């Protein structure tokens, strides 16, 4: 859905300007960041803190703007357009040139790429030859980080890219940021961005194939066993194995590949039936005090 292209060139210009600040400024920031990174990625808990930090930041966009806020308004779920004084009027009326809409759109673009930048830093430490990340934590940390990176790029593609088709797949739309480099990455076609999203999701699925959720369920509560780490519980609140497969189904559907979308979706349904991971909510769970 090509809804925000009006602001994209301006945002890229800002990014280029940011890379041309003085060397002293960059040196100071780099030094401080390197020290903080060294401390953060000293153990498994530090890696989990970095990953959880991205999940926490998501609330800033997905708590409203990219859920029940601006996007739902643009989908005409609310009767807003009739009231020209409404704070969401510009979104409802598709007035993309208005300052308020531009400001929100800029925030979406920059925030999503900021989340991606943090994930890339985390991923670079996962793959470092001197990584302190244990074999137990690595599939979860790296798998979820890759899935989140794909998820954010997919939202950027849906929002700023074209309505996908054979005629538009080669439209140049956006960069796929997959390194910690401050260099502006080349703009890619919608087809190439989608391919990189699928690549990240496939790798995430492989890493998470032994996700505890498949054997133990969502584990939606703390354990009495002191050796049962909380980091591996509450799997329904994270991009777990099933969520990655569901995201692949969404991507296939967006690309118009209904056969693979169907195959991914039905595989999740079958897996849940066989493994019983997501039971129906019992009445007393929502009515008891």
Whereabouts are the PLM-identified features?
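Bacterial Sec-dependent N-terminal signal peptides
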Residues: 1-32
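Membrane-proximal, proline-rich intrinsically disordered regions
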Residues: 23-72, 265
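Hydrophobic-face positions in mid-chain alpha helices that act as interaction patches
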Residues: 49, 91, 238-239, 253-289
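Inward-facing hydrophobic residues that define packing positions of alpha-helical scaffold repeats
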Residues: 51, 116-119, 194, 201, ...
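Conserved, well-structured interaction surfaces
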Residues: 86-160, 183-191, 206-208
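Alpha-helix C-terminal capping/termination sites
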Residues: 155, 159-162, 217, 222, ...
């Amino acid at each position: 859905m090509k809804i925000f292209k009006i602001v994209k060139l301006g945002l890229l210009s800002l990014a280029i300007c940011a890379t041309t600040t003085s060397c002293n400024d960059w040196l100071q920031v780099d030094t401080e960041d390197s020290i903080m990174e060294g401390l953060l990625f000293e153990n498994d808990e530090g890696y989990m803190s970095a990953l959880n930090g991205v999940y926490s930041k998501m609330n800033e966009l997905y708590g409203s703007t990219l859920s029940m806020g601006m996007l739902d308004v643009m989908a005409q779920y609310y009767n807003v357009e009739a009231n020209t004084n409404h704070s969401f009027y510009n979104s409802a009326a598709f007035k993309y040139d208005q300052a308020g809409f531009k400001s929100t759109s800029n925030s979406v673009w920059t925030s999503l790429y900021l989340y991606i930048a943090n994930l890339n830093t985390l991923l670079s430490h996962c793959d470092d030859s001197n990584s302190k990340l244990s074999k137990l934590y690595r599939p979860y940390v790296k798998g979820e980080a890759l899935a989140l990176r794909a998820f954010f790029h997919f939202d950027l593609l849906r929002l700023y890219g074209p309505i996908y088709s054979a005629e538009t797949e080669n439209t140049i739309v956006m960069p796929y940021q997959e390194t910690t480099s401050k260099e502006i990455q080349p703009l890619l076609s919608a087809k190439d961005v989608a391919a990189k999203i699928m690549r990240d999701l496939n790798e995430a699925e492989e890493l998470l194939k032994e996700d505890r959720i498949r054997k133990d369920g969502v584990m939606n509560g703390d354990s009495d066993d002191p050796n049962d780490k909380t980091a591996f519980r509450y799997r329904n609140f994270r991009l777990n194995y099933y969520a990655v497969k569901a995201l692949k189904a969404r991507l296939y559907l967006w690309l118009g590949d209904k056969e693979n979308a169907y195959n991914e979706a039905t595989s999740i349904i079958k897996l849940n039936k066989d493994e019983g991971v997501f039971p129906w909510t019992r009445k007393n769970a929502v009515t008891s005090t």
